[in-house]
Each structure stands twice: as structure tokens, then as C-alpha cells.
């Protein structure tokens, strides 16, 4: 219902929405491809740069190198560009459309002016990204036997952050995953299971479903009759497998 309300409101126009989606996709992918090409024109030829930009934004996780993105594990710019594309592609076109609509008014509006759905998706995404990165960093830092993660703390956290973002929606890797501990792999699997936002390029059960499941467990423990998100309740009858599928 939240997704439908956000996308199919009274002023919704399908043609305008599709045009905005196309503009967002082309704009992000072309800009990312240009940055990659200017940064390293040897590896990122025009085709290679565009391929990796599209692969990142569409959360495909495909790379042209046989070892995926391992060669760029110490390249902060490439890591940042790929991460931004993954996040934007996995947050949902409805959320992106709403954020761009606010920014296009010529001033930065407070976060509270976003819809409840957008705030829920953005806040949960940020939490999962940071929490996943911290867990991987703590587990893998200075762990004996993992030569891929030998270096200063900032570099290790950047790799942890990259994989926290990539695992949930895309699948790129900058290190040999065979060297990771079982604890880190479990963190990655949980992030893969959750996935991205509704109406996005990402897979998984989706962020809204994850929040509903967590909220349902918390409500049962507290003895509450309904889940409350941002001062609004979710009726128990909406917590069905059908609802989970649609979300």
C-alpha cells in the first residue's frame, strides 16, 4: 500500500514517470561512465566504462576482468563511483524521483518532507550499509590468514564498506571471497537476503519487508497489537505472505 501510494497518487502520470526513470538511469550511468573513463582510460575504455556503470546501477555485478574488481581494491575513486551507482540503483525509482523532485525546487528541504516510505527506505539502507561494513571490518581486521585485507584501517574499512553495499544488491567483489571468515560470509548472506528498496533494480526480500518482519517480531515481544512505523500503525491483517510478495 505504501509503494502504491507513493507511486500512484492522485497526480501520478505514467508517461511522466517513465520519462523521469529513463532520465535518471541515463544520467547516472553516463556520468559514472565518464568519471571512470577519465580516471583510467587504459582499463576503462568507453565501452568498458559504460559497461561497468550500467552493471553497477542495474545491480548486475558483472565485470569484464576475470577477477571482477580485485585490481581496483586500492583505487578509492573507482570504489566510490561503483558504490554510488549500486546504492542509487538499489534504493528504488520512486524514492529517487521524490528526492529529485525536492532538490529541483531550488533548495534543500528537510528529510521530514519525504514520504514515510522514502524515509523508511533511506534510513534502513544507511543502517544496513554502515552496520554491515562495521561488522565485516571488526571481524576481518588483522585476522591472520587474510592477506587481501592487510593495510591501514581506512583502506580496510573502504573494502568493508564496498562489500557491504555490493552484497545487498549487486555482487561485485574487490577481494578473494575464499579468504574471508565464516562470520563475514554470514553477514554478507544476511545482506543478500534483505536486498534493496521496492521498485528498484535490486533483489532480495526488499527493505520494507525486512522492516515489517523486524517490526512484527518486536511487536510480538512487547505484546503490541500492531506494528508502528513513524507514528503510523500497520494492521495485523496486512502481515501476510501476499503482502510480503507485493512489497
Indicate residue ranges for each PLM-predicted region.
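Membrane-proximal intracellular helices of multi-pass ion channels
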Residues: 1-247
